[in-house]
């Protein structure tokens, strides 16, 4: 069975193939399938956004489509950046991290010292016959004072995983 990976993010493609490659069988990127689409992620939750993308790509290709939506939720910022994680600053990863750290500094100035956070990831697999499977998971940690570690993408350099004992 062929499955379309409903993302234009090459980092996500790499991670999905590393984690789920054998379980999914043959996977195609949007580029490999000749699909030029970037559905608007306007859902209120990670699951809604994952479903929006998977449904649209499944509709366009008539193949099963796997999508994810993930983001960082910081307790001191009332869950921000949340579902807007990738678009938090209006720029790229470095700008998003800079804005996140600045907003945490402002929160600390107001007496809010909690830096706990979690990453949420929702995945959706949509089939041409209308079946939909979703799942959501979280990993917990806190935000560091500055970027650390090597590799990763997005907020990985500032998210310290309490489970792993290091930044992503």
Where does each model-flagged region fall?
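Anionic-ligand binding patches
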Residues: 2-4, 10-168
């Amino acid at each position: 069975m062929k499955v379309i990976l409903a993302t234009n993010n090459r980092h996500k493609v790499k991670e999905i193939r590393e984690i789920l490659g054998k379980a999914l069988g043959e996977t195609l990127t949007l580029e490999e399938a000749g699909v030029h689409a970037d559905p608007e992620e306007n859902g209120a939750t990670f699951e809604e956004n994952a479903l929006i993308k998977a449904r649209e790509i499944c509709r366009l290709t008539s193949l099963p489509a796997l999508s994810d939506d993930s983001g960082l939720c910081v307790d001191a910022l009332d869950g921000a950046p949340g579902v807007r994680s990738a678009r938090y600053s209006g720029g790229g990863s470095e700008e998003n991290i800079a804005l996140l750290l600045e907003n945490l500094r402002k929160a600390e100035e107001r007496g809010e010292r909690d830096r706990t956070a979690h990453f949420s990831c929702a995945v959706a697999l949509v089939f041409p016959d209308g079946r939909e499977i979703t799942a959501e998971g979280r990993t917990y940690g806190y935000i560091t004072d500055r970027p650390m570690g090597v590799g990763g993408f997005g907020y990985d350099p500032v998210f310290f995983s309490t489970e792993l004992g290091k930044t992503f």
